[in-house]
């Protein structure tokens, strides 16, 4: 995917966060810890040892902060073994995860979280709400990948935990890394300052050739198959409008400094139609309508052999803008004159920046990041898009937020069944607009 290649004492110290100065300093011991011989190593746990989780750990361990990876958790032994070897080979002095701290299974996350000061949450996103809730309950700082949930009940759980995290002064960074990318920050700062007036419209895109697929293996139970091939099942992924296109939808909300009041649109399965592709669509086209009447058009598709486009453009009352993950950020006035262009060379990797800034704040005893609420609301925006395309209905913000259609299985076990199952031919039921009920 072309625009996504950018790849005891301390716990007690961090828990002393009740003493605040201006809402910023976590505790009175932050300075002393660095000058008194106290072990100020920040212990981190990785929850989800796939490619993205391994990448997140790589970025965390690449920061200048004094970190050590002390625990890992995953559902699958092979993913754990691969991740542990890669990280151990690269960061010999920073990885201390013996076999008894490499936890396997559906409850492995609890054991790993208990041992850390900071947790990295990077499992398939269907598990994110329960993992985030556990981390916050145990008083841990958090980096969690997007999306933070795949359905409305999950969003509500994340929003509730986000409020607790604020009260506990726990730093939370969500992996919507464009928020940490210099061209986006510089361009958005100018937009918020009124450089192109009020945003009245826009277009956001993630059009690409699709992602990996893991075909069914003979020995797999249905639960294992769906978890191995998780991208194609909504309880795990949320469909690509949620799992991937949320990046661009988040930029729409950032540009508007608001969230849509309603969404309508259409989608289908046109290219990915076989049984290996589960239940999700391969294209979505939706309109995000905001309270002031502005409409932003959102398009995402996974079609092989078609033109790729992953970027955002917005129109204001005084001009327009173009942004992309390729470090572009351009503003024009209403006559077409360029008034700002961010240099595309020499920019930091935003995947690294989000970890650099998070761990710098934690190391200094600062409370600076509360991304969870914002991340949850942009994820809800994307979920609304899926609700709209699956049902063919106009979906309003409040009804989406309060929906009770949980996608999560009633039981987590290798011999338990998820809620969506294949027919005798191995094909899964596909949402049909006008018939499918989402709320």
For every predicted segment, state its role.
Residues 48, 52-53, 167-174, 178-278, ...:
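Predominantly a Rossmann-like dinucleotide-binding segment in NAD(P)-dependent oxidoreductases
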Residues 16-92, 252, 437-439:
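N-terminal Rossmann-like dinucleotide-binding module
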Residues 118, 129-180, 194:
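Beta-strand-loop-alpha-helix segment that lines the small-molecule cofactor/substrate pocket
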Residues 90-121:
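A structured beta-alpha segment of the ubiquitous adenosine-cofactor-binding alpha/beta core
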Residues 1-21:
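N-terminal secretory signal peptides and thylakoid transit peptides that target proteins
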